[in-house]
Amino acid sequence: TLMTKMWTYDEGSEKREPVSKTLDRFRQEAGTDYFDILLLHCMTKGDWAETRKFYMDGLAKAKQDGIVKAVGVSCHNWDAMVEAVDNPWCDVILARLNPFQSHMDGTTEAVNELLGKARKKGKGLIGMKIFGEGKHVSDAERERSIRFAVTESNLHCMTLGLESIAQMDDAIERVMRNAKG
């Protein structure tokens, strides 16, 4: 699955450029004709659907044209996540979730419950900050984090911040072991 995120600016910003131009640059840089998932990055307010309509419209056209298969948002605020759950434009939500309630937008239980509502609506759910933005990386904490993400959360998949092949191998081994139950 090829996913990327697009930084956005408020309505009226001189930094805004046409979505199609940004997507053309992304596709050239990645050497691809399309992206499976494209997210509006770092939504921090519940009104993102109003303030980011320019981008939503551009991505809706790209989706219609087959340049993007699914669209969504990365959430960095509770209200932004609620908006993502309720907004039919949003196919995928990237949300901060871990069993330590570290660097999240609510309690572990509340975020997981909200994501359960999104899951029932057919949205794709990707977890981030699984290790609490690198604050919970002891062996026991990594195990607990992966076990939670794989067996207890409403996530479909997760992104992990890793710094080495050994860390990647460790994470894969933990996911595979926990997925087998």
Language model: regions and residue ranges:
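Intrinsic structural disorder
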Residues: 1, 6, 24-34, 61-63, ...
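Active-site groove signature of glycoside hydrolases
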Residues: 27-47
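Glycine-rich anion/phosphate-binding loops
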Residues: 12-21
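A structural signal for isolated positions on well-ordered beta-strands in alpha/beta enzyme cores
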Residues: 1-3, 36, 72, 126
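Short, charged beta->alpha transition segments
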Residues: 22-30, 80-82, 114
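Beta/alpha (TIM)-barrel catalytic core signal, keyed to glycine-rich beta->alpha loops juxtaposed to Asp/Glu
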Residues: 42-181
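A short, structured active-site edge motif that brings together acidic residues
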Residues: 1-11, 38-41
